[in-house]
């Protein structure tokens, strides 16, 4: 059976026509050594710093050390399946994560992959994890309040939208509780805002190096309260490799910036940055970078400053969005002068200092009002709050000073005794159970009662009961006053003070 020449040429022509001209070219290298989450790779000559590379089996890594003869790559995942001689491919893209509203209500890892078992997340946009912070021109000074619902914080250490307020304290002093209450407190504001995006606040919580059980507990609380609907949880738990714990805060910030850059508002909680610094130290030492103070690398300040500078209040031309940050730092034995705490204190716009001693005395949240400050928040405080909260900080400072002296002398004059009595009641008034944030108007009423002598005749042990009963009275009989404070935001002096005094007096006369 002979094959016709024409047939042969037709087959050849057909094959030539269908031949793909596009040859896939990928720059590949080979693994020289691997261990402790670090791979040394030879042959990736044109790789960029911070570029994503791919190992066999889809494991991803990031090129961090570009040396003359090899590249130091940190591995996002288990290094058990990577061996010497494996090929490593460039992806030609800097480490990016998915961003968008589709992430709300979900729990993701440091690369944006879902880990809550609710199926894949289909986002329309991705963003580079470690982008440059906004410059000076697009920014605006902080002027809108970011209410936490905690009396001690909102009255004395106010936080504004676009601020970075550090929460610092030893282990088990309630640092996460303060941040979680701030997230839960947004529910009433977001519900009241309806479709008005300029009033809503979206929340991103980043767990760095925490126990999985702790993160699961927190997610459960967010789900129970319905706060998960406006929140994203990014988890790089203690069992994740160090590169994931290092990357998670940057990824989460990229997710939060989606809201900031679209004229909306977001709050991000980093829990906690001490563990991120530790994982970065581990990576740096394994990459053979020279150690500095406390064996941290020389650029550990830049690690945190470039992260926290991305939280900002943008001006009118940039859409008026904001990103507020609550970084958490854990101290050892109350030592605020250690390397990482001093670094982050100098980067942030104030700190909430929590003390073990106060916590064990039952003063919770255990805020040390003397050492805690808010450097820019006072301009963001509501008029009503700033007009009633002024005397509180002064009274408590005088009380602390006098209480120290009062231990020595028994015969105190009447004015000192009165100052001590009021200080004790105000301290009691600042206590607040977890998961029970109050609205701005409610805090104004409570503090007004405390500073205007309504508590002077109440026993210290009954202050909590007085506060609860007062709030119930205001909600049931004087909800118009609460609404007036919320909507009008009046300065509480003159007629406004008389109006509030009348409402509280009516209750105080019957309280027993």
UniProtKB/Swiss-Prot annotation:
Looking up InterPro entries in the UniProt record yields: ATP_synth_asu-like_sf, ATP_synth_asu_C, ATP_synth_asu_C_sf, ATP_synth_F1_a_nt-bd_dom, ATP_synth_F1_asu, ATPase_a/bsu_AS, ATPase_F1/V1/A1_a/bsu_N, ATPase_F1/V1/A1_a/bsu_N_sf
Indicate yes or no for the key word Translocase: yes
The UniProt keyword set, sorted, is: ATP synthesis, ATP-binding, Cell inner membrane, Cell membrane, CF(1), Hydrogen ion transport, Ion transport, Membrane, Nucleotide-binding, Translocase, Transport
**Has the keyword Ion transport been applied to this entry?**
yes
Q: GO MF annotations for this entry?
A: ADP binding; ATP binding; proton-transporting ATP synthase activity, rotational mechanism
CDD domains membership: ATP-synt_F1_alpha_C, ATP-synt_F1_alpha_N, F1-ATPase_alpha_CD
Role noted for this protein: Produces ATP from ADP in the presence of a proton gradient across the membrane. The alpha chain is a regulatory subunit.
Could you say which residues are annotated as the site Required for activity? 372
Q: How does the record describe its quaternary structure?
A: F-type ATPases have 2 components, CF(1) - the catalytic core - and CF(0) - the membrane proton channel. CF(1) has five subunits: alpha(3), beta(3), gamma(1), delta(1), epsilon(1). CF(0) has four main subunits: a(1), b(1), b'(1) and c(9-12).
- Give the protein's recorded name: ATP synthase subunit alpha
For this record, the Gene Ontology CC terms, alphabetical, are: plasma membrane; proton-transporting ATP synthase complex
Looking up PANTHER family in the UniProt record yields: ATP SYNTHASE SUBUNIT ALPHA, MITOCHONDRIAL (PTHR48082:SF2)
Record-listed ATP binding positions? 169-176
From which source organism is this entry?
Roseobacter denitrificans (strain ATCC 33942 / OCh 114)
Enzyme Commission identifier(s): 7.1.2.2
The compartments listed are: Cell inner membrane
Q: Which reaction equations make up its catalytic activity?
A: ATP + H2O + 4 H(+)(in) = ADP + phosphate + 5 H(+)(out)
Per UniProt, what is the membrane topology? Peripheral membrane protein
Its main subcellular localisation, reduced to a broad class, is membrane
Q: Which family does it belong to?
A: Belongs to the ATPase alpha/beta chains family.
């Amino acid at each position: 059976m002979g094959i016709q020449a024409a047939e042969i040429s037709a087959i050849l022509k057909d094959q030539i026509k269908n031949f793909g001209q596009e040859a896939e070219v990928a720059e590949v290298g080979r693994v020289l050594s691997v261990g402790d989450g670090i791979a040394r790779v030879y042959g990736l000559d044109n790789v960029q710093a911070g570029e994503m590379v791919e190992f066999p089996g889809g494991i991803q890594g990031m090129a961090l050390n570009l040396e003359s003869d090899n590249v130091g790559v940190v591995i996002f995942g288990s290094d058990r399946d990577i061996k010497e001689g494996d090929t490593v491919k460039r992806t030609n893209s800097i480490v990016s994560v998915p961003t968008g509203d589709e992430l709300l209500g979900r729990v993701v890892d440091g690369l944006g992959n879902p880990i809550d078992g609710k199926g894949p997340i289909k986002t329309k946009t991705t963003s580079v994890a470690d982008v440059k912070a906004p410059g000076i021109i697009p920014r605006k000074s902080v002027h809108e309040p970011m209410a936490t619902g905690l009396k001690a914080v909102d009255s004395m250490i106010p936080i504004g939208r676009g601020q970075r307020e550090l929460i610092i304290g030893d282990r088990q002093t309630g640092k996460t509780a303060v941040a979680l209450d701030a997230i839960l407190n947004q529910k009433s504001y977001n519900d009241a805002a309806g479709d008005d995006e300029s009033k809503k606040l979206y929340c991103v919580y980043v767990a760095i190096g925490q126990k999985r059980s702790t993160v699961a507990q927190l997610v459960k609380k967010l789900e129970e309260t319905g706060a998960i609907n406006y929140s994203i949880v990014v988890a790089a738990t203690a069992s994740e490799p160090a590169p994931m714990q290092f990357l998670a805060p940057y990824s989460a910030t990229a997710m939060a910036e989606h809201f900031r850059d679209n004229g909306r508002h977001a709050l991000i909680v980093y829990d906690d940055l001490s563990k991120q610094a530790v994982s970065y130290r581990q990576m740096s030492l394994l990459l053979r970078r020279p150690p500095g103070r406390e064996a941290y690398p020389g650029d550990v300040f830049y690690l945190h400053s470039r992260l926290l500078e991305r939280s900002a209040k943008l001006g009118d031309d940039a859409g008026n969005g904001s990103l507020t940050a609550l970084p958490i730092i854990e101290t050892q034995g109350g030592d605020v002068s250690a390397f990482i705490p001093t670094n982050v204190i100098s980067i942030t716009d104030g700190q909430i200092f929590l003390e073990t001693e106060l916590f064990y005395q039952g003063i919770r949240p255990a805020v040390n009002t003397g050492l805690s400050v808010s450097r820019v928040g006072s301009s963001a405080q509501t008029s009503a709050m700033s007009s009633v909260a002024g005397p509180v900080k002064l009274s408590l400072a005088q009380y602390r000073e006098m209480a120290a002296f009062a231990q020595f002398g028994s015969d105190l004059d009447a004015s000192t005794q009165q100052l001590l009595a009021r200080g004790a009641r105000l301290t009691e008034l600042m206590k607040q159970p977890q998961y029970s944030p109050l609205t701005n108007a409610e805090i104004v009423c409570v503090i007004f009662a405390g500073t205007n002598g309504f508590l002077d005749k109440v026993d210290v042990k009954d202050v909590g009961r007085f506060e609860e009963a007062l709030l119930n009275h205001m909600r049931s009989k004087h909800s118009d006053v609460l609404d007036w404070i919320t909507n009008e935001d009046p300065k509480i002096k003159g007629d406004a003070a008389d109006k509030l005094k009348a409402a509280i007096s009516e209750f105080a006369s019957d309280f027993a």
